Swiss-Prot record:
Pfam families per record: RNA_pol_N
Subunit: Part of the RNA polymerase complex.
EC number: 2.7.7.6
Transmembrane spans: none
Record keyword Nucleotidyltransferase present: yes
Protein name as it appears in the record: DNA-directed RNA polymerase subunit Rpo10
Lineage, opening ranks: Archaea, Thermoproteota, Thermoprotei, Desulfurococcales, Desulfurococcaceae
Entry keyword set: Cytoplasm, DNA-directed RNA polymerase, Metal-binding, Nucleotidyltransferase, Transcription, Transferase, Zinc
Length: 77
């Protein structure tokens, strides 16, 4: 998932805050403290940043693909 560019509810631009938000959380701050430091005070914007997860780090652990048994391949000739 791409980081949010705008708040899903009010439309406030948030994309420029995403890298700093991740840095602050990685440095040990809670997401709430990081959002306070960034000046994100609307609860809709806080929710948009807080619940946005980049799933690529999790998905990269798994093998992606579809296994089709050989007998099924014969059906498609």
């Amino acid at each position: 998932m791409l980081p949010p560019v705008r708040c899903f509810t009010c439309g406030r631009p948030l994309g420029h805050l995403w890298p700093r938000f991740r840095e602050l959380v990685a440095s040990g701050k809670t997401p709430g403290e990081a959002l306070d430091e960034l000046g994100v005070d609307r609860y809709c914007c806080r929710r948009t940043l807080f619940t946005s997860v980049t799933y690529i780090e999790h998905a990269a652990k798994y093998r992606v693909g579809i296994h089709v048994p050989p007998e099924r391949l014969k059906m498609w000739g």
